[in-house]
C-alpha cells in the first residue's frame, strides 16, 4: 500500500502545545474507525468506539440484484465458486447497511421528500444518482466515549504515523 491521504496543521489552544502536527494514512495509519462526538455547543467530547463502525455499502438494487459478483469479490473466489450462503451473507449486509444508513453522521443520501433531513421511509441512502455508494468515517481523537460523552476507552493512533499528537480531525 503506497498511497494514502496526509494532512498537516499548526494546532493551537488544546493544551498539547502549538506545533505542526501531521496525520493520515500511508504504510502506517494515524486514524481509527468512528466519528467524533461533540456536545450541543460543538465541543469535542471524544470519539465513537471503533467496534461500532465499518464500511457501509449500499446499492439501489440490493434486494433484487444477482449478488454473485459482489460475493465473489467479498470472499475472494471465482464467481463460479460462490455459494448461495455467501450470496445471502452479502445480501444481509446490504440490507443492514440500507436499513441503518448513518445519515445522521454525515453519510450522503438522496433527500427524496425534500425536507432537509434523512427519513428512512422515503429518502434513498447513498450518493444521489449513484448505483452504489461506500461510506466510512474515521478520526484521530484518542478518547473513546459513549453517546452521553462518558469515557469508555482510549486508543491513540496518531503517534503511529510520524510520531505526531492528534489534530482532532474526522475524515468521511
Task: List the predicted regions and their residue ranges.
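A long-range scaffold signal marking pre-active-site subdomains of enzyme folds
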Residues: 1-172
